[in-house]
Amino acid sequence: MRRPGQSALALALAGLVASVAGCALPDGEWFGAVPTPDPTHFRWCNSGEPEYIDPLLASSTTDLKVVYALFDGLTSYGPDGRPMPSLAERWESSADQRRFTFHLRRDARWSDGAPLTSADFVYSIARLLHPLTASRNVEAGWKVRHGRAYTDGTAKLLLADAPPLRAGEVVEVLPDGDAPPPDSNLRRARTPLALRAAPDDNTAAVWGRVPAGGNVTIIELGGADRRFAYLHHAAGADGVYGWAPLAALDAPHDAHRYQVRELLDAVAARALPVDRRRTATALGRELLMLPELLGVSAPDPYTLVLETEGPTPTLLDLTAQKALRPVPRQAVSRHPRRWTFPEHIVTSGPFQLTHWRQRDRFELVRSTTFWGRSEVRLERVTIYSLGDQSASASLYHQGGCDATVANNVPAAWLPALAGETGGTRRRDYTRAPFLGIYYYIVNTERLPNAHLRRALAHALDRSELPALLKGGQLPSVQLTPGTPAAALTAADRALCGLAEDSPLHALVVEAGLCYVPAPGPAFDPLRAQEELALARAELGEKFPTRIGVKFNTGVEYHKHIAEWAQEQWRNHLGLAVDLEAQEWKTYLKATVAGEYDVGRFGNIGNFPDPEEFLSSFRCASPDNRTRYCDPEFERLLDEAELEPDRRRRLALVARADARLLDAAPLIPLFVYTQHHLIRPYVRGLDVNLVDQQDLRRVSIDPAWREAAP
């Protein structure tokens, strides 16, 4: 069972943290005494309590350490962080990079023994894109043909002829007069209800009536009698589900007429000099939102076909990440709000969840149904949910865990661990590059004036950050992380067009292809004062008297950086700044709700591509916490997504990047480095640019001393 509360471990660590942090770190070859390992059990110190372990909802690095142990994908992350075959044994793509065919393993199983088939991917991608799911990862699904329109509720399947349109066509629905477009999946009342039903004579789009206050999920088509719809009403802990006759359901919009037009794919639409899409009228009952209209199909149980809006050479890179990992329909349908609890969860990865105690730990055991179970060396995995760096590193020091996740060590300890304070560099400490950027987000609804936001950005002297952070981080005015010019090879510098002494960094996307991210406002106190004066003139009495900065607890340098920014803005701009620390989950909810002025944030890329870092600033992105919305930024990214030439695509992305940074809804601060503590007996816990580890490769070597140099 998952139970809230503070564990005995956390209480015991309180005194331990004080004792370790209160004095200089003891010198030695290793950080703490190396315990005698259990060759079957791996203990991992995570950086906090996951917000979600549902792959479609998980978004933070804290979530993913658990998610990737439990759920498999078409591909998984290899030792270098790039995709390698997993549930998909092989794949091929069309010459225009718009159709991708994956051939699935026939021995893949869910943990309840059910076969894992292509239908599970179709279901999961439709669930990802469904507006009721409200996934912050939905942009990954927008690559799929009609994905964006499906989320927006504007793409429908026409169920009856409406000349010149024919039944079965995917159409875009437009309002007819003042009537809103019909939404076949939402009931226009206090409680939404998702419904699916196939056409039966003239009965198609329907609305259901459920008790007030109930929650909702998805209704699946099924059964021989098409006059029945399967509905799921999630009430209380588990909910109820079953079949309901269509005659018992409301259909308030079925008699409304709507303008409908053919929905061309984005490439065809762009090619038309004039909008010549056919338009007709249809009844609400003749329109239905169905997953079948998406560019996702399952020709047979072991073949999955994905069709995209435009050329998508990066699609394979997306197949390893959380949003495209399948979820079990059989568990989600029965327990929509509790399906990830140990007593209900059904998984597909190398490990199964047996115990979850909130703010304490996850207990996992080797899966007996995982297709690659013979390759899994561990019998047990314990993942501690330690939302405090000092507690995590202290538990490691005392032999309580075998490794820490990236950057779960206090910044003040890093110089000693690296041997930079005169002692010995600890052999179990690793520092490595990281495809991640740390920045401040600015709520553009609370601070709508771009001059004020630019003043904040120009007033920060980022050159002071390395001394504050102590971990080799790279100060940055660029959003997309990369490699400093001085650290690039001569050939890559030539490719990127950078001199060795350039203050900029660059991202080598692939061999022969380089992206130099656009720089944002750099430190310039005079320019900051000029922008501030313009802001005061434009805002007048609406100029804010105080600005708030929020950050999450658990990582000590978030507070240090906030105090540094507070001082910089006071000294260079004369602004009064209030600081507020919040627990991790509370902080996430506050930023999503827009309850902040300035907040700390970070983004770790899944693969080396600048769109990984720009997409969350799109107008409709569920993860757009800044509320920034710029039609020209949207247009440039839309055009880039459809551009088959990769160099021209990056040129368009660079223009969007520059426009975003000039508007300053975010303020880049530094490129992350990653810091790990890993016991010498741990094997296969890969340190790579994207910080993704596959626990199926991890093992414990009890004879490590014999192999040590």
Listing of model-derived features with the role each one plays in the protein:
Residues 263-292, 299-303, 310-382, 388-391, ...:
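Gly/Pro-rich hinge or "lid" segments in bacterial periplasmic/extracellular proteins
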Residues 90-166, 259, 270, 305-307, ...:
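Aromatic- and charge-enriched surface segment that lines or borders ligand/interaction sites
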